[in-house]
UniProtKB/Swiss-Prot annotation:
Record family assignment: Belongs to the MukE family.
Primary site of residence: cytoplasm
Gene designation: mukE
Protein name, as recorded: Chromosome partition protein MukE
Compositionally biased residues, Basic and acidic residues: 218-238
Organism: Aliivibrio salmonicida (strain LFI1238) (Vibrio salmonicida (strain LFI1238))
HAMAP family, sorted: MukE
Length: 238
């Protein structure tokens, strides 16, 4: 084993970091110690994960994550459509002036209100009903789904809980939902278009305890409708 790789693996931070990466966690600069470890040993750990048919990716924004291949020994899974939509709205908010005005802190309710403003209401209602319109009860069900999505995205490292329950700060890792807009002159406007058009953006695996599926390339999820679940192949930002 190369000396520098042995040094990385021997680091007391590595076991927990390895577990986080395998669960789908994104390691951004806010996670100071783990991020510094990945920066120092990026090449060596990249070679290490190749043995598991996975790629250690450093995104243009500086955060790290694992990208399993179809033959990977590391489990892969999918995100539900509502998770994808919430992620795209988070990315939009990250790019917005409101983030600076709020010192980077948002509430669950603010995220939900922004979702209702930005997204197509008919598509939103279809996430909880088979109808294009919904009652107040349906909106409450949608809010519950949004809260569940935020908990999932928190485990993936997309948001960081702040103080009391219901407040969070958005991590740069949300750019996993904005890969298609990185090269656009107006990234905020391009992200808004993605939200309104309902276009999918590829995202890495969700934590295994949350609806985890081991997928072969192009495999279908026969027990989940196409409207409820994106059959994502988790191939990264490209």
């Amino acid at each position: 084993m190369p000396e520098k790789l042995a040094k990385a693996i021997a680091n007391p931070l590595f076991p927990a970091l390895d577990s986080l990466l395998r669960s789908g966690r994104h390691i951004a600069s806010e996670d100071l110690d783990n991020h510094a470890l990945l920066c120092e040993f990026e090449h060596e750990l990249g070679m290490f994960y190749q043995r598991y048919h996975a790629e250690l990716v450093k995104a243009p924004e500086g955060f790290f994550y694992l990208r399993p291949r179809s033959t990977s020994l590391i489990a892969r899974s999918v995100l539900a459509e509502v998770d994808m939509l919430v992620g795209k709205v988070l990315c939009f908010l990250y790019l917005s002036p409101e983030r600076l005005a709020h010192e980077g802190i948002f509430t669950n309710q603010e995220l939900f209100d922004e979702l209702l403003v930005l997204a197509d209401e008919q598509k939103l209602m279809k996430l909880v009903t088979n109808r294009a319109s919904g009652s107040d009860l349906d909106k409450e069900k949608l809010f519950d789904k949004v809260r569940t999505s935020l908990r999932r995205l928190k485990r993936l490292g997309m948001i960081i809980q702040v103080g009391e329950q219901g407040k969070f700060r958005i991590s740069e890792a949300v750019f996993r939902f904005g890969a298609d807009v990185r090269s656009n002159d107006d990234m905020k406007e391009a992200q808004l278009r993605l939200i309104r058009d309902g276009e999918a953006v590829v995202v890495h695996n969700e934590e295994s305890s949350q609806s985890s599926f081991d997928l072969d390339e192009n495999e279908k999820l026969s027990d989940i409708s196409a409207e409820e679940q994106h059959e994502l192949e988790l191939e990264g930002d490209a």
